[in-house]
Every structure is written in C-alpha cells, then in structure tokens.
Amino acid sequence: MNTSAPLQNVPNATLLNMPPLHGGNSTSLQEGLRDFIHTATLVTCTFLLAIIFCLGSYGNFIVFLSFFDPSFRKFRTNFDFMILNLSFCDLFICGVTAPMFTFVLFFSSASSIPDSFCFTFHLTSSGFVIMSLKMVAVIALHRLRMVMGKQPNCTASFSCILLLTLLLWATSFTLATLATLRTNKSHLCLPMSSLMDGEGKAILSLYVVDFTFCVAVVSVSYIMIAQTLRKNAQVKKCPPVITVDASRPQPFMGASVKGNGDPIQCTMPALYRNQNYNKLQHSQTHGYTKNINQMPIPSASRLQLVSAINFSTAKDSKAVVTCVVIVLSVLVCCLPLGISLVQMVLSDNGSFILYQFELFGFTLIFFKSGLNPFIYSRNSAGLRRKVLWCLRYTGLGFLCCKQKTRLRAMGKGNLEINRNKSSHHETNSAYMLSPKPQRKFVDQACGPSHSKESAASPKVSAGHQPCGQSSSTPINTRIEPYYSIYNSSPSQQESGPANLPPVNSFGFASSYIAMHYYTTNDLMQEYDSTSAKQIPIPSV
C-alpha cells in the first residue's frame, strides 16, 4: 500500500503547516509524519468499516426482514413505514456503500478507479446518507410530538406517510444527483470533495444546510424528550397532595367525587395526554359513579398497582438514558463530516488535515447507520443481547477457555421442566425488568397455582377467581419492556399502567394517591372485611 504517492496527487492535500526545522532533512521529517498520520487514519477507518459491514448489515437486515414476517404482516401504525425506509437506507449503506468506501481508501487516486465506480459511489453515498438523516429527523419530530401530548386522535393515513416518504426520497436524491453531475474531474474519488467553484460550491452549500438542519432537529428533539421524561419520573415519585375530609373516609377505589357529583380529574404529566391514560381514567371514574357500592378491591390488586407504577418509573429513567445515547451518537458521528464540509465551503484551499478529517467523517457517518438498528428498532434490545452474546463467546474463544455453567434445579419436579423455566426467565426481558412478586401474593391475586404447595392449602379467599397461571410466571409478563418512544409510535395496545386490567372499575391515579394517604389499620381492615382470611398489607 503506497500512502505517499496518492496524497501527492491530491489537490486538497497539501503539506502540514509545520515550523521549519534546522537541517536539510526537514522535508523528509514532514513527509514521514504525514505518512504516519495517513496510515493511522486508514487503519482506524478500515477497522470501523469492518464493524459497520458486519454488525450494521446484520442488524439492518434483521429489522428489514421483520416487517415481512407473517407475524408482523400488518404494521402496528402507519408511521412504522418510516422505520422500514430507514432500515433499507442503512442496510444499503452498510452492505454496499461501506465496502465501496473501503476500496476508495486504498486507491485514493482516481486514475486507478473507473469513472462509473466513482459516479455510483458519489450518488449512493451522498443520497443515502442525507436520506437516512432525514428519516431520523422525521422520526424524532414524531416522537417529540407524541411525548409532548400533541398527537391527534386519528393518526396519519398511509397515503400521507407514503407521500412524505416519496418527498424525502425525491429531495435527497435530487440534491445528490446535482452534486454528482457538477463534480469536476479530480484525483479524489470522494463525494463533495470536488465541488470547489461555481455552481458546485452552491450545491455544496445547500447540502451543508440540509445536513446541519437534520442534525440540529434530531439533537434538539431528543433533548426535549429527555427533559419531559425526567419531569414525568419526578412527578411519579412525588404525587400531588390532595386534601381529604377525615370525618368521612373515602372509598379506596375510584376517583374522588365533588359535591356536585363530578369526578376530580387528576393532573398527569404531558406524556400521557391524548393517550390511553385519559381513556382509562374517564371510563373508570364514570364506572365508579354508577357502581359506588361495589365490593372493595383486595390488597393483592393494590400490590399489583404499586408494582406497575414502579415499573413505569423505571421505564421513564431508561428512556432518558436512551435519549442521551441518541444525542451523543448523532453529535459524535455527524460533527466531523459537518465540520469538514463547512470548511470546504468557507475556504478554497484544502489541507492534508482536512482530507484526513473528511475520511474519518465519512467513516463515522457510515458507523451511525450501523448503530441505527440497535437504537431505533422495535427489537433493539434483542439485537444488542445477541451481539453481546457473540462478542462474549468470541472473546472466550480467543482466550481458549470455556464458560462452565451449572444447572441448579429450582424447587421440586422434573429436571427438564425446571430447565425450561430457567431459560424462559433468563430470556424474557419483561420478567427481568418487572418487579419480582411474592408467591403468596400471586396466588391471592390469580387464584391457586398448580404447584404442590398450593394444593396443600385448599382454602382460597372469597372473591378471587383462579386464572390458571403458574406461580413461577410473573404478573403481566406481556408488558413490553421498553417505552413507546423506542418504537415509531405508541401501539394500539399500550403497555404499562394503562394496560393493566381494571378491577371493579377504580381510578388509576386516585388509587395510587389513596395508597399513600389511607394506610391506617382500621381502614384497611374495613376494606378487607369481606375476605374469609385477612390478607397482610405490604408496606408502600
């Protein structure tokens, strides 16, 4: 690999602005330092491009094929079509454009590269890069609109989403085609590197404005989402104080009722506005006003509510961390290329450092396309676990050692059954993230299990219906382990507190507040007086 010969023919690659050294070998020292820097840049970019080709192609291919799986044949929302387009753009960048860029790195002189290859590389890299950024910006605006509570009652139709997608494709590749056609014959086979004068500089300026606008939209949107989610988590930890008449104890379930019979609307953060929370609150408070003399809910259901609230708060914190990761990845991967493009617009003369910065910037922007499926996809957690599993066993293979695992039987029964239970709990992310319930509270909430312990105690509290759920399975394991902002939009079957089955039509927020303010033993005994056996009340 000859690193000095191509750079000498590059019009944008001049010598480093180094102070002159005493002696006749100052030029040789400069050339040696320049060759060392360029070699280090090539090694770093090649290593990152290998990671992009392997991990990025795998992740985007899995995400792209998931939309054509029979179980996901119908999109959850129309906006999922944007995720499909994003995965296609990133798959093309990681699988086709990144190997082409690797070829360009080792043959920097355009004299050794066919013109058709340079034209294809210019068009695909410029078009798909800006298209991927526009898709990410549109998804960020959609999620910000959803979190801020400005999502309309009816989602956008598929025709509107399709028109928006076609508009983004048209604008992106029109700009890329103009930039490719206006490229002068150069010794560099890099996009935007030859647009140095006349109309080429105007097209480069337009490309820089579009690139900068997309990066700014993504960064600002996810910063605002993170702030909203952080405030939402703080509100959940510190519930509002409501003045209650102590002379007349309020019922534990349902919303508090004013003198004129209207239920008090509990204020919630903006995250739940125009979502299923308001529907749940309205239906439950309305049901309470009609059925105020119903049976009080048992203590096990109150424990389930507390677990759901803690689970939702944990998801808020996890969503904040994800927003921070998205902002950092966008800034780190997009700023080097943006700085090099701005420098090309402002100055007519390039430099050797600018050329290295441009190479590293294109590598990082391709690396961002490799990271997208592990951040934006619906099954991003599963992809990350598989990659970590592969890296762990690859490292163990290099160290020539095996990881010894011992299977310990869980309770009584067949070893094969316990092995299946153990593997199910280790791979079920909802079980790992949800709070671990006690066995007796699960039996009290869902009826007797099929274990031997429950068979030995045939007495069951009155009012409980058996649901046939094993005691080893947690409550509500179908809760999705990630927040709705991780997906393109909230599903029609929302997860979290709104997805819990209402018991005797009680209000969610008022039950949560009542758990904090009505904890006296006399009141609890009055609520559980209908049970045949007193159920111990957990500390909240």
Swiss-Prot record:
This is Probable G-protein coupled receptor 75. It is a multi-pass membrane protein. It comes from Mus musculus. The lineage of its organism: Eukaryota, Metazoa, Chordata, Craniata, Vertebrata. The chain crosses the membrane at residues 47-67, 87-107, 121-141, 161-181, 206-226, 319-339, 351-371. Belongs to the G-protein coupled receptor 1 family. Residues 1-46, 108-120, 182-205, 340-350 are extracellular. The keyword tRNA-binding does not apply. The gene is Gpr75. Its main location: membrane. Keywords: Cell membrane, G-protein coupled receptor, Glycoprotein, Membrane, Receptor, Transducer, Transmembrane, Transmembrane helix.
